[in-house]
């Protein structure tokens, strides 16, 4: 199992091939910045500070994301990637902040996948953000870079609202699951061509995928008492699931409570600071209070034919994916028994 120090970092940067060259287009293409901060060193103004410096260097960072925001669910990842590709982003900047300091990694965005691991990346580390930015600026000064980014916004674009369905939101469970199989979307393994990796990176990739396998085994364990037909599959688009005759797929979303409820089609009360989640306990139901700003998990079922979303009879979000999955499955089974 991965150690806490490994889990805390952006896993993509550990699998990149680091070179002495900056990605092509750093001052001419659009850039997305991906940030990860460990809680003990979190700075709410980090993106603003970073953007001011990148703009001064002629880097057009048109989008800022937090790493766990990108991986906020299978559909969230897919739709976020599609939105970035639609905006013709070519360069990725990863900023990792930990108690050990700052790491800045520049890479190339992929097409089918988030990162193009075949392309060379550039990385710098330091004790402060100013230190790594100065070293980036000095590197850029040694190169004859084509500058064409003249309309860079003054402030970073942080907010992104992903709509998780295109049809109707139903606050119930699809009773058709008593007859049709439920496709449960598994956590995805990470695939990188082994020829691109060194021994240490191959070990890291193996360790990462072992942890994914444990999580997927846990999903199947939670569903061990599910009385209807269920199949555990790698996630696909709705169209791909539908083509393979799967009408209903179970997925999750991981976001701050307010964003989560909006993405899933719930009515939002702007004055509400907390949400009440219904969770099963010993055959009964109890209530749990969740902070509106804290990130939580919520499972839901999507109908692949038309984009309808079934959120369940209860708002059953929870702090861990295991608890959220158990909540949704158990409450759905209880409802089907009535």
Predicted regions and their residues:
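Bacterial Sec-dependent N-terminal signal peptides
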Residues: 1-14
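Short beta-strand and adjacent turn/loop elements
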Residues: 11-338
């Amino acid at each position: 199992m991965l150690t806490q120090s490994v889990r805390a970092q952006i896993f993509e940067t550990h699998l990149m091939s680091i070179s002495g060259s900056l990605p092509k287009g750093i001052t001419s293409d659009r850039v997305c910045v991906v940030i990860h901060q460990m809680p003990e060193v979190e700075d709410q103004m980090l993106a603003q500070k970073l953007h001011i410096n990148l703009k001064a260097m002629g880097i057009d960072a048109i989008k800022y994301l937090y790493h766990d925001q990108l991986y906020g669910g299978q559909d969230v990842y897919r739709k976020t990637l599609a939105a970035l590709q639609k905006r013709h982003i070519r360069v990725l900047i990863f900023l990792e902040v930990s108690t050990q300091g700052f790491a800045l990694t520049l890479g190339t965005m992929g097409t089918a996948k988030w990162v193009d691991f075949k392309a060379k990346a550039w990385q710098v580390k330091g004790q402060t953000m100013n230190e790594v930015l100065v070293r980036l600026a000095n590197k850029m000064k040694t190169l004859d870079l084509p500058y064409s980014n003249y309309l860079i916004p003054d402030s970073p674009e942080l907010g992104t609202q992903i709509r998780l369905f295109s049809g109707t939101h139903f606050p119930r469970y699809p009773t058709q699951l008593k007859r049709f199989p439920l496709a449960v979307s598994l956590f995805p393994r990470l695939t990188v061509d082994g020829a691109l990796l060194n021994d240490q990176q191959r070990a890291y990739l193996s360790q990462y995928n072992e942890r994914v396998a444990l999580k997927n085994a846990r999903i199947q364990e939670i569903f061990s008492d599910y009385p209807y037909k269920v199949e555990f599959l790698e996630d696909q688009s709705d169209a791909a699931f539908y083509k393979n005759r799967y009408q209903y797929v179970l997925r999750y979303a991981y976001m701050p409570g307010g964003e989560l409820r909006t993405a899933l089609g719930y009515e939002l009360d702007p004055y509400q600071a907390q949400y009440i989640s219904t969770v099963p306990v010993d055959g009964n139901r109890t209530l749990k209070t969740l902070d509106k700003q804290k990130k939580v998990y919520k499972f839901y079922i999507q109908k692949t034919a038309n984009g309808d979303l079934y959120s369940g009879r209860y708002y059953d979000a929870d702090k861990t994916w295991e608890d959220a999955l158990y909540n949704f499955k158990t409450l759905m089974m209880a409802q089907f028994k009535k």
